[in-house]
Amino acid sequence: MPQKDPCQKQACEIQKCLQANSYMESKCQAVIQELRKCCAQYPKGRSVVCSGFEKEEEENLTRKSASK
């Protein structure tokens, strides 16, 4: 049986917040930050819900090194 995603709760909170606020991301920054904190606690690849943040981070690093 697969393990439960350690950051699933925070991901669900983001969905609830977005639905409650007409998908205005700016109103959900606090819950988004909570998910980022959760993702930072686990090794890369451990949480499926964190994969978007991991990809974003990789792209930012690629852009920074390309601009040097």
UniProtKB/Swiss-Prot annotation:
Keyword Disulfide bond: yes
Highest taxon of the lineage: Eukaryota
The CHCH domain, residue ranges: 4-46
Disulfide links within the chain: 7-38, 17-28, 39-50
Chief location: mitochondrion
UniProt entry keywords in alphabetical sequence: Chromosomal rearrangement, Disulfide bond, Mitochondrion, Proto-oncogene
Written domain comment of the UniProt record: The twin Cx9C motifs are involved in the recognition by the mitochondrial disulfide relay system.
Protein name from the UniProt record: Cx9C motif-containing protein 4
Annotated source species: Homo sapiens
Gene: CMC4
